[in-house]
């Protein structure tokens, strides 16, 4: 019994992290649930997994209620391995319950592809007969997957690989603390940058002529995957403003969120312009863009 209690205490922050992720997934599922209610679609396919995710999250958080120490390498590594299956299993449930993907393997693949922000899909979300709730849920899954990458980058990964954390601290002047409240603060900072870039992309798509729903879903997918799973979506419209909005959004998605937060926190845009990483990123874009333009002019 004592050995079990010791092992449980050694994993308390792991359970707290897993519980937080499950609770976020549960809350996120209420967004397509509300949208489906509004448009008189099958809303229960989102309500059931939402309740399950929140119950699971509360249970995990209860297991980690006694966290009063630093996260260890074992917890960090275990979280980075198991958080993706957790997200994928919870994310696949609306596809199975709706009947659009009856085979659980297909639904799991669709969910994994979304949360890992690959931009790959076995469904055509541009179809007119696709449920709005599922289109929205696919975009949210992509967006949450990108957010999870940022949270791991800014909170967990520096504790698993000390050199990585020291490199970020030295170059970006951001201090990463393994204490839970500091981890939560880093996560909030990453979320703030990610949400702000998504809002900017949404406004760009809106200005390009998309309706609010399409602008929102495209912004979430573009920012998370640095592209779109539906190239035909843009080809069918043949709109230069829309393509420009997508291109700018893709460039925004490639920015370092930690650097963006540092510039915002210090109110210094010049700080970003002096960053070597951003200079290399902009230079690579300009050179490759010039080469592509030159090749197109030749043909």
Predicted features along the sequence, with ranges:
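Membrane-proximal intracellular helices of multi-pass ion channels
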Residues: 1-299
């Amino acid at each position: 019994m004592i050995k079990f209690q010791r092992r449980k205490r050694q994993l308390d922050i792991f359970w707290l992290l897993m519980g937080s992720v499950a609770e976020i997934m549960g809350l996120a599922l209420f967004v397509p649930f509300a949208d489906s209610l509004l448009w008189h679609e099958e809303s229960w396919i989102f309500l059931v997994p939402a309740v399950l995710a929140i119950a699971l999250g509360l249970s995990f958080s209860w297991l980690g209620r006694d966290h009063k120490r630093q996260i260890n390498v074992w917890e960090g590594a275990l979280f980075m391995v198991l958080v993706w299956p957790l997200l994928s299993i919870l994310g696949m449930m609306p596809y199975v319950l709706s009947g659009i993907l009856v085979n659980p393997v297909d639904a799991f693949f669709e969910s994994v592809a979304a949360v890992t922000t690959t931009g790959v899909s076995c469904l055509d979300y541009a179809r007119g007969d696709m449920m709005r709730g599922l289109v929205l849920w696919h975009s949210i899954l992509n967006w949450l997957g990108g957010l999870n990458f940022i949270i791991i980058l800014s909170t967990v990964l520096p504790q698993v690989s000390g050199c990585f954390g020291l490199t970020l601290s030295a170059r970006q002047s951001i201090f990463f603390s393994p204490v839970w409240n500091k981890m939560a603060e880093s996560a909030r900072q990453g979320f703030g940058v990610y949400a702000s870039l998504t809002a900017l992309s949404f406004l760009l798509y809106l200005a390009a002529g998309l309706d609010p729903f399409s602008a929102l879903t495209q912004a979430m997918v573009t920012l998370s995957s640095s592209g779109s799973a539906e190239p035909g979506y843009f080809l069918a419209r043949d709109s230069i403003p829309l393509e420009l909005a997508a291109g700018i959004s893709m460039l925004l998605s490639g920015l370092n969120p930690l650097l963006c937060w540092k510039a915002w926190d210090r109110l210094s845009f010049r700080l970003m312009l002096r960053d070597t990483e951003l200079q290399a990123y902009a230079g690579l874009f300009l050179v490759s863009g010039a080469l592509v333009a030159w090749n197109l002019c030749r043909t």
